[in-house]
From Swiss-Prot:
This is Holo-[acyl-carrier-protein] synthase. Its cofactor is Mg(2+). The gene is acpS. The keyword Disulfide bond does not apply. It comes from Rickettsia typhi (strain ATCC VR-144 / Wilmington). Its main location: cytoplasm.
Length: 128
């Protein structure tokens, strides 16, 4: 059963400006420790795109839950990792998921400078 759909678009140059001002403080604000490990392994020119995609993905996922970032869920509650084929996989912290019925999240990410987009679908694992 469909719980919700969310999407978000981010201008990569906007993230570049934020990185120039705040450097890695911004990354530490929106990335989980697992994502930060990935981030630090990237070449510096790829930092803005990585952050833009994670920002868009987390916004899209929060919108699919119907709450938005800061309204019961925050950036640190959502981790975006990639499987062996590069597919984005979403993990939501147990602090948040304990309040919900079992669910599965589908996420699609795409970027074509200067834009990146995320599209998320949340569905319940329960049959009605």
């Amino acid at each position: 059963m469909l719980i919700g759909v969310g999407t978000d678009i981010v201008q990569i140059p906007r993230i570049e400006k934020i990185l120039n001002l705040y450097q890695e403080l911004f990354a530490k604000k929106i990335l989980t420790s697992q994502e930060l490990k990935q981030f630090t392994l990237l070449d510096k020119p790829n930092h803005a795109t990585f952050l833009a995609k994670r920002f868009a993905a987390k916004e899209a996922v929060s919108k699919a839950f119907g709450v938005g970032i800061g309204q019961g869920i925050n950036f640190k509650n959502i981790t975006i990792i990639n499987d062996n084929l590069g597919k984005p996989v979403v993990e939501v912290s147990s602090h948040y998921t304990n309040k919900l019925i079992p669910f599965h999240i589908h996420l699609s990410l795409s970027d074509d400078y200067p834009i990146c987009i995320a599209f998320a679908i949340v569905e319940s694992n329960c049959s009605v």
